[in-house]
From Swiss-Prot:
It is found in: Nucleus; Chromosome. One of its GO terms (molecular function) is single-stranded DNA binding. PANTHER family: HOMOLOGOUS RECOMBINATION OB-FOLD PROTEIN, UNCHARACTERIZED PROTEIN C17ORF53 HOMOLOG. This is Homologous recombination OB-fold protein. Interacts with MCM8; this interaction is necessary for MCM8-MCM9 helicase complex recruitment to DNA damage sites. Interacts with RPA1; this interaction associates HROB with the RPA complex. The keyword Methyltransferase does not apply. GO terms for cellular component: nucleus; site of DNA damage. Coiled coil: none annotated.
Length: 607
């Protein structure tokens, strides 16, 4: 290959130009290391002093590592690795290198890339003597690539290109400095490889081109001299940019003595990734592109804990990366679920899910007020008449008029606990009906006033009231026909054995029939208007017992008439009437349904 053959020619040229005592590198033995002072004292008398600052150079080889078959040249001076512990930092900077040995013939060079550990040691003025000035200039000139367009300045001090990111510490500036013309110089780090890296693959940092060496040969950069501008060399259809912006800053290897002394020092080879392009030396444009090149140099690795990590590379923007970034920026959204509203049951069972009745009508009201439909289908005109009482207050309703007439005629007192006006008032009837304390769901005696009356083709719906409250009820249509002019709002009804219809514990209704009516105190009739109640007994029973019927029929009227006379006491007559009503209510119903039995018993003949 042309590139490797050029490197061989450069090596042969340098080896042939060397004096008899050639500089060779020998691997460190397992015995204890010598001190830097003793080691440098052995090296000092071998070569004349030079005023040029020199960095350790790694000479490239054209083949894979091989073992050294011939011993090193006679009279050669060996450089041994020295382990230096810095008192200021306390950390040991280690680097891997290769032992580079040159044969005396100069035709073929073999490098044994065996792992050895070397240190970068710093010496004072006159401690190290390098090659002759002219020979070193020739060696530098032969290693540069003319086609790449990158020509480092070769003055009395060799140029060195350093990454800008090496200047981390403001006190310890990591710029390359030029040795003084008086002859003071410093020794650069001697780079050797621990194990070879046979090939390098192109990455984004090198522009996609293979790099023949990942270890940079950095020289000292003269103070105040400008950094060479980046130049481009087209190789195999691609452009390789040679400049500081292509360098990936690595982990610098520095001499521990330079930390404590504060003198200008050289940055050693960097330890970037395999994609590092520090001081890339690409092939000339006339050379053919190389797919993969064996690495004559190996990237040294630093194990120091005080150096910084390599800079992160810019990620390649892909669709998957964009999706990941957008997914992290989004707020997590829960999957929309259809809201299932739990249906609450008003009571257990499927009927509890039925909707509410919006009309607000009770079943009892519908049963009472809705007329029955005739079988022929023709509906009669629904006639309703709602009449309300004209009195506005309880005192006006019950302090005068028919209510006062009824109390004075019967000599009743509402405050008396034994009077039926108190024991069977509307409040007490509703309470006993709810507690089911009414005998046979009937009220023995009761006096109520009509508050409102709603007439219909059937029975009339009435609202009854007394001084304690109000109660709903119905009036039979027979009473509406016989007492049409008397059944008006404000009239007082004296009732007995009134049935109470209780469809629920809260709803109770009075059913007034002709048999329940005792007397009506109306607004138009006056005090002397009395009504005879209907005959409670059947005709057959009345015919068989003619003496019983007048007594039963006349006794209520007699008690009411005696109430008009002051000398007579109504209290004595009323209990007898109440007892008679109680006896009649206790009679069995068969007593009224079998009139033939009474006649048979009266005559003494068997039935």
């Amino acid at each position: 290959m042309d590139f490797l053959s050029a490197l061989e020619n450069a090596e042969n040229h340098i080896v042939s130009a060397l004096p008899g005592d050639a500089v060779c590198l020998r691997p460190n033995s397992s015995r204890p290391q010598e001190t830097p002072q003793a080691h440098s004292s052995k090296l000092s008398p071998s070569y004349p002093a030079s005023n040029r600052s020199v960095l350790g150079l790694c000479f490239p080889t054209s083949r894979m590592p091989e073992t050294i078959k011939e011993p090193p040249c006679k009279g050669a001076m060996f450089l041994r690795p020295v382990s230096i512990s810095s008192s200021s930092s306390g950390s040991q900077q280690r680097m891997t290198g290769t032992k580079v040995s040159q044969e005396s013939s100069g035709r073929q060079s073999s490098a044994a890339h065996s792992g050895f550990i070397f240190e970068s040691c710093q010496h004072g003025i006159g401690d190290f003597e390098t090659l002759d000035q002219d020979e070193f200039d020739k060696a530098l000139a032969s290693m540069e690539f003319e086609g790449a367009g990158l020509e480092p300045e070769v003055n009395r001090g060799a140029s060195q290109i350093l990454p800008a990111k090496h200047c981390e510490d403001p006190v310890l500036a990591k710029k390359a400095r030029v040795a003084d013309l008086s002859g003071s110089f410093q020794e650069g780090p001697i780079v050797h490889c621990r194990k070879p890296w046979p090939s390098l693959r192109p990455t984004t940092a090198t522009g996609g081109l293979p790099v023949p060496a990942t270890s940079d040969i950095s020289t000292s950069h003269q103070r105040g001299s400008p950094v060479p501008a980046p130049q481009y060399s087209p190789v195999a259809g691609r452009t390789l940019q040679n400049g500081p912006q292509n360098y990936v800053p690595g982990q610098p290897l520095q001499s521990p003595r330079a930390w404590s002394s504060g003198k200008p020092r050289f940055s050693g080879p960097q330890c970037p990734h395999s994609s590092s392009a520090a001081f890339c030396r690409g092939p000339s444009p006339s050379r053919a592109p190389v797919s993969s090149v064996e690495s004559p140099f190996s990237t040294p690795r630093s194990t120091s804990t005080t150096v910084t990590q390599p800079a992160l590379q810019t990620p390649v923007v892909t669709n998957h990366l964009v999706q990941l970034v957008t997914a992290t920026n989004r707020t997590p959204q829960q999957p929309s679920r259809p809201s299932i509203r739990a249906k609450t049951r008003r009571f257990p069972g499927p009927a509890g899910l039925l909707p509410h009745q919006h009309s607000g009508e009770n079943l009892e009201e519908i049963m009472v007020s809705t007329p029955q439909t005739p079988t022929h289908g023709a509906l009669a005109k629904f006639q309703t008449e709602i009449v309300t009482s004209s009195q506005g207050s309880v005192e006006e309703d019950f302090g005068r008029g028919p209510w006062l007439t009824m109390k004075s005629a019967l000599g009743l007192d509402e405050g008396d606990p034994t009077c039926f006006l108190y024991t069977y008032s509307i409040v007490m009837v509703l309470r006993k009906a709810a507690l089911k304390q009414l005998p046979r769901n009937k009220v023995p005696n009761m006096a109520v006033m009509i508050k409102s009356l709603t007439r219909s083709t059937m029975d009339a719906s009435v609202v009854f009231k007394d001084p304690t409250g109000e109660m709903l009820g119905t009036v039979h249509r027979v009473l509406l026909e016989t007492h049409q002019n008397e059944l008006k709002p404000g009239s007082v009804l004296l009732l007995k054995q009134i049935g109470v219809f209780s469809p629920s514990l809260r709803n109770h209704y009075l059913n007034v029939t002709p048999n329940n009516l005792v007397h009506i105190y109306s607004l138009d009739s006056g005090d002397g208007d009395f009504l005879k109640p209907p005959q409670p007994l059947p005709k057959d029973l009345g015919n068989s017992h003619g003496s019983l019927q007048p007594d039963v029929a006349a006794e209520p009227t007699q008690g009411l008439r005696t109430a008009q006379n002051p000398p007579a006491s109504p209290e004595e007559e009323l209990p007898e009437a109440d007892d008679l009503d109680g006896l009649l209510s206790e009679l069995p119903e068969d007593f009224f349904c079998e009139p033939s039995g009474w006649s048979c018993l009266k005559t003494g003949h068997p039935p």
